[in-house]
Amino acid sequence: MVHLTDAEKAAVNGLWGKVNPDDVGGEALGRLLVVYPWTQRYFDSFGDLSSASAIMGNPKVKAHGKKVINAFNDGLKHLDNLKGTFAHLSELHCDKLHVDPENFRLLGNMIVIVLGHHLGKEFTPCAQAAFQKVVAGVASALAHKYH
């Protein structure tokens, strides 16, 4: 569960409506793979991940980023039940994919960075703080099965 004030909820919902989630997802996942190259090991089937330009232009990275951000979007609709919303994905990433749960936090930070890039001056420090709460809640929910 994420506890947001009414002002934080308004900021998150208002700003989220101003971005193209598909662009945010692909760019955030791409940045994760570039900035933290050890995360590439989970994406062997994605083809060429040999350089930043290859990663950022990779259609499989963009497609998976879209899936990631669609799940994130579902989380925004269920901030009071993130553990329930992400239970299946938590189990999948823990039991089948064996993803290090720290990567969820790293990806959340990439989402925040990309939002800042796309929203510019509208992404105020208060808006960033609200989104940091959300991505921390999502990362915690995704890591829930690991506990």
From Swiss-Prot:
Tissue-by-tissue expression: Red blood cells.
Keywords linked to the UniProt accession: Acetylation, Heme, Iron, Metal-binding, Methylation, Oxygen transport, Phosphoprotein, Transport
N6-succinyllysine, modified sites: K18, K60
Limits of the Globin domain: 3-147
One MF term in the entry's GO annotations: oxygen carrier activity
Modified residues (Asymmetric dimethylarginine): R105
Residues annotated with N-acetylvaline modification: V2
GO cellular-component term (any): hemoglobin complex
Positions that bind heme b: H64, H93
Source domain of life: Eukaryota
The keyword Transport is annotated on this UniProt entry: yes
Phosphothreonine modification, residue list: T124
Phosphoserine sites (modified residues): S45, S51, S53
PROSITE patterns per UniProt: GLOBIN (PS01033)
GO terms for biological process, alphabetical: carbon dioxide transport; cellular oxidant detoxification; erythrocyte development; glutathione metabolic process; hemopoiesis; hydrogen peroxide catabolic process; nitric oxide transport; oxygen transport
Entry's family note: Belongs to the globin family.
Annotated function: Involved in oxygen transport from the lung to the various peripheral tissues.
Subunit organization: Heterotetramer of two alpha chains and two beta chains.
Name of the featured protein: Hemoglobin subunit beta-1
UniProt organism field: Rattus norvegicus
